[in-house]
């Protein structure tokens, strides 16, 4: 498919007008009843935010200043995804490979001005790339009770600025076990940090595990869940890899460890089943599609 876009911005004497044609391609092929492969590719444009283009300086603290950049330009994003699904009996899986390239992306930079202040701003840098292979495997349900799933992947980042170049690799995983027997069901889920790197900033994702159990009786459902039952420390954070003003920060939330959650629900969707049955019984078209006339 092909679509177009138009972007216009003007601030005093600065501004831009941009017309774009944005192609998108989707392909798929089924090798057999158990194997299917698909490809998706697209080109898109990203415009700078108005707040980033404002010629305004804001004080962050006694040493840092946030500044806009009215010279920011639209940049181009290229995305490619290749995916394959396969199934054999109780075993199924998915292989996913994605690649993204951004040309002259708007990313951060930090400079030191004549007042010895660190000015944090954005500029059209050289390029940003992300490569992400991922594998997902699933087994079950075994004896109509147990289901196992596991996924793992790698995020590789290449961030090139006008005066910096950073690469970063992150391995991540996610595992889950689900069980269901009669009116009871339970699950255990865990995953580690899935981090993101853009410009000169590394943002750490969440790392947690969860244990849950529920019981269903007719329309009543009672459940409980414990977040991070086996650790006593939960944190999130990030790092700035600027050569003039590097930094690291963490947020510790102890309340998110061994956090107990209870849930009680009641299904009150009465009448819906009766209406559905009536529609099935009366699913008859008696209209012949002609007008009737009579005296």
Residues covered by each model-derived region:
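C-terminal beta-barrel architecture of Gram-negative outer-membrane proteins
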Residues: 152-159, 169-216, 220, 225-248
